[in-house]
Amino acid sequence: MNILENINTEKRNPRSLHLDSMSIAEAVSLMIDEEYGVIEALKEQHRNITEVILATSYSLKNGGRIVYIGAGTSGRLGILDAVECPPTFSVDYNTIVGLIAGGEKAFIQAQEGAEDDANFGKEDLQSINLTAKDIVVGIAASGRTPYVIGALEYANSIGATTVAISCTKQAKISKYAKYSIEAVPGPEVLTGSTRLKAGTTQKLILNMISTLSMVSVGKVYQNLMVDVKPTNQKLIERSKNIICEATGVDYTTAEKFYLKANKSVKVAIVMILNDCDYEKALAILKNNNNFIKS
């Protein structure tokens, strides 16, 4: 039996049948045009994406974690999104977690066969002490990866919330999740190479999940990353500029309050907006569940 026969990501793209004989310029134009399918796929899944983000936000607000899990490109994209959150939002590295079939070494070198064992998905979730407060986001472009199915089955068994993200309709993994996103950008220019449009589609979904979940817990003021962690010179300067933008003060004043606030952008903004000292600003934030109220 051909298990890939009816999977969207395995179909041939009629527009790229002669990819091997196109000029580079023609192929570039084709690949650019094909990306429009990504946006259409996301628009079609607007309601489902919204429901997932409401669920991930609920988990974070109630002390849970967002756990991405996938194999190959899907797993790497989950890790990529997860590791960007601590410097951007000053969250713990355990708040948004990325797991990949085959372990960390699989991020840079493919681990053959790791995705084919459902038990590995279960074991990886057990290794991070998954709880019912957490939400597990299974990612599989083909919608059928055993590693992801095993993870979702285990998550369901302990009462964790489950999400399935795929790039094919009637995906097998959707049957194992409370919420599902089936965003289908169309056949790949290079048949079956889901690191292309499917990967782009998944990355944009993860961007929305992490960013808007962080907005929901007060990590953003207006459209400013007020909980940024200033770990290098660029981020230090960005921190001061954020204070300027949020409060209207000049650079020198922003720098002064940045230091007074122990290099916390959020606290500095509250100090300026409320004309108060450091301790009072902390109390205001605590009273507002760490949201800046203008």
Curated annotation (Swiss-Prot):
Tell me the active site: E84, E115
MF term (GO), any: carbohydrate derivative binding
What EC number(s) does the entry state?
4.2.1.126
Q: Which PROSITE patterns match?
A: GCKR, SIS
| Coiled coil stretches, renumbered | none
The record places domain SIS at 56-219
Named in its record, the pathway it takes part in is: Amino-sugar metabolism; 1,6-anhydro-N-acetylmuramate degradation; Amino-sugar metabolism; N-acetylmuramate degradation; Cell wall biogenesis; peptidoglycan recycling
Catalytic activities: N-acetyl-D-muramate 6-phosphate + H2O = N-acetyl-D-glucosamine 6-phosphate + (R)-lactate
Keyword Ribonucleoprotein attributed: no
Pfam families referenced in this protein's UniProt entry, alphabetically:
GKRP_SIS_N
Q: Name one GO biological process term.
A: amino sugar catabolic process
Annotated TM spans: none
Would I find Methyltransferase among this entry's keywords?
no
- InterPro entries xref list: Etherase_MurQ, Glucokinase_regulatory_CS, MURQ/GCKR, SIS_dom, SIS_dom_sf
Query: What keywords is this UniProt entry annotated with?
Result: Carbohydrate metabolism, Lyase
Report the protein's function: Specifically catalyzes the cleavage of the D-lactyl ether substituent of MurNAc 6-phosphate, producing GlcNAc 6-phosphate and D-lactate. Together with AnmK, is also required for the utilization of anhydro-N-acetylmuramic acid (anhMurNAc) either imported from the medium or derived from its own cell wall murein, and thus plays a role in cell wall recycling.
Additional free-text comment from the UniProt record: A lyase-type mechanism (elimination/hydration) is suggested for the cleavage of the lactyl ether bond of MurNAc 6-phosphate, with the formation of an alpha,beta-unsaturated aldehyde intermediate with (E)-stereochemistry, followed by the syn addition of water to give product.
Listed NCBIfam families: N-acetylmuramic acid 6-phosphate etherase (TIGR00274), PRK05441.1 (NF003915), PRK12570.1 (NF009222)
Describe the subunit structure: Homodimer.
Instruction: Supply the name of the protein.
Output: N-acetylmuramic acid 6-phosphate etherase
Organism, as annotated: Francisella tularensis subsp. novicida (strain U112)
